[in-house]
């Protein structure tokens, strides 16, 4: 299939965007030392996206199964690195073992795909794993943001990644419903796919930047809430903690009243 100039321009722009992002996060990790562990993972995620999309650009429908798996595996590894970056950024326990197990399951299932329908079934498996990985990253990002800010701000931070996850879920469901030969006709052109990856790379790096900003602001707020010499909380921090304690106390009292009512009924 001949490669159009539009596809070439889209690929160059994607490579430029992901490459600049990878270099920027690497500088933040090594030189500026801003969240070094998380920034390094974000840089690796962008590098893996560059490699995976580059292989995807030269992939043809008649390519062998290993070539198909190579591009998908690199992009899925980018999703794993992205999730690991969020976990490191917000000081959460690592989930690399679970991600490796899922990747092994994906690889085993992908090897069982017949050659005459590899585009359909590999796309279905790719969408399923992408939804699981990005969906869990969305949950991590929302929970970490909601612990420091109001829920509407946490929703705004996690919304781009949640939208991407839902798109992969929609693709998975459509792959189940539409016949394999129809899906091949739908994905015959690559321009739409490159536009999707361009938006994806842009939204992912915006989400990474916003999550890093959330973590930075939360850390500054935590340092500002307490006096570094005496360890005492300031007036605003005390008011927030008193409100939280009052809310917990009211919940416990309501729970106790419900239990007492049930006991009396018995």
Regions found by a protein language model. Give the residues of each.
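Cell-envelope/extracellular polymer assembly enzymes that use nucleotide-activated donors
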Residues: 254
């Amino acid at each position: 299939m001949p490669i159009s100039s539009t596809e070439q321009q889209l690929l160059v722009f994607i490579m430029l965007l992901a490459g600049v992002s990878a270099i920027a996060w690497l500088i933040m990790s090594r030189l500026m030392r801003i969240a070094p562990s998380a920034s390094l993972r974000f840089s690796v995620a962008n590098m893996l996206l560059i490699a995976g999309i580059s292989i995807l650009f030269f992939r043809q429908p008649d390519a062998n199964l290993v070539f198909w798996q190579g591009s998908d595996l690199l992009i899925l590894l980018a999703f794993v690195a992205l999730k690991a970056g969020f976990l490191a950024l917000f000081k959460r326990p690592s989930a690399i073992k679970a991600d490796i197990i899922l990747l092994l399951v994906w690889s085993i299932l992908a090897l069982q795909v017949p050659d005459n329908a590899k585009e359909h079934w590999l796309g279905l498996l790719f969408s399923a794993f992408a939804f699981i990985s990005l969906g869990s990253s969305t949950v991590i990002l929302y929970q970490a943001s909601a612990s420091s800010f109001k829920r509407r701000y946490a929703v705004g931070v996690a919304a781009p990644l949640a939208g991407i996850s839902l798109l992969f879920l929609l693709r998975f469901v459509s792959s189940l419903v539409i016949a394999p030969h129809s899906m091949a006709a739908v994905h015959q052109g690559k321009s739409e796919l490159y536009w999707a990856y361009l938006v994806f790379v842009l939204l992912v790096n915006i989400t990474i930047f916003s999550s890093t900003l959330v973590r930075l602001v939360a850390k500054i707020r935590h340092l500002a809430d307490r006096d570094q010499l005496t360890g005492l909380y300031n007036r605003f921090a005390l008011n927030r903690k008193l409100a939280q304690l009052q809310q917990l106390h009211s919940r416990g009292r309501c729970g106790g009243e419900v239990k007492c009512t049930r006991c009396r009924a018995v």
